[in-house]
Curated annotation (Swiss-Prot):
This is Probable cytidylate kinase. Pfam families: Cytidylate_kin. Its EC number is 2.7.4.25. Belongs to the cytidylate kinase family. Type 1 subfamily. It is an enzyme of class 2 (transferase). It catalyses: CMP + ATP = CDP + ADP; dCMP + ATP = dCDP + ADP. It comes from Vairimorpha ceranae (strain BRL01) (Microsporidian parasite). Transmembrane segments: none annotated.
């Protein structure tokens, strides 16, 4: 049996770090769905300047895209593009890319490809994992934190962008994620909400680990 853990939540809530540490604890494969969207955004931005996301040319290009994943790295044409996915430009562009239904379907297909490669367990983090990608997940988690706390965390990771700009970006992204037509950020049915404002990463991981053990035992 392949166990599945879905971790959803807004930008900066600690999904990626939590999933990475859980992977080390459980020995499961992890998928960062946000990185896949960022990879699509990066390839589109670097291949087509000012791409018309509604054009047939772009749709056909996206449908042929393929990526591979190795731990936390994303490979495109056998090149590791992970270091290019966290720029301010991609931060802004990915929210537009993620709104398009055909791109969401493509990312879903890629996620399913990665899921099939796992024979023990899978941890997927994103914004619509418990609702659309893994509705049958063994455990569904929704990580949350206040915008100010999330902005502080992001600023510590990327001090090249001011705290004020980081906070404004998070508030804007929250609105976009929660109001988009397809794959909106919501708490999945049956998900356990964990507010991480006053919790360390280790405390969050311990809590999810205990919840998972209770589920499977």
């Amino acid at each position: 049996m392949v166990y599945k853990i879905a971790i959803d939540g807004p930008a900066g809530s600690g999904k990626s770090t939590t999933a990475c540490l859980l992977r080390k604890r459980l020995g499961y494969k992890t998928i960062n769905s946000g990185s896949i969207y960022r990879a699509v955004a990066y390839v589109l931005d670097s291949t087509f300047k000012n791409a018309d996301l509604e054009s047939k040319n772009i749709r056909d290009f996206v449908n042929l895209l393929d990526f591979d994943m190795f731990k936390d790295e994303i490979l495109y044409n056998n090149h590791n593009i992970s270091n290019y996915l966290r720029s301010k430009r991609i931060d802004e562009y990915v929210s537009l890319v993620a709104k398009k239904l055909y791109i969401r379907k493509k990312v879903g297909n890629l996620q399913n490809k990665f899921i099939k490669c796992s024979d023990t367990g899978i941890i997927i983090e994103g914004r619509d994992i418990g609702t659309n990608v893994l509705p049958d997940a063994t455990l569904k988690i929704y990580l949350d934190a206040s915008p100010k706390v999330r902005a502080k965390r992001r600023f510590l990771e990327r001090p090249d962008i001011s705290y004020e700009d980081t906070l404004a970006g998070i508030i804007e992204r929250d609105y976009s994620d929660k109001t988009r037509e397809h794959g909106a950020l919501v708490v999945a049915e049956g998900a356990i909400i964990i507010n991480t404002d006053d919790m360390s990463t280790e405390e969050v991981v311990d809590k999810i680990f205990d919840l998972f053990q209770n589920k499977i035992n």
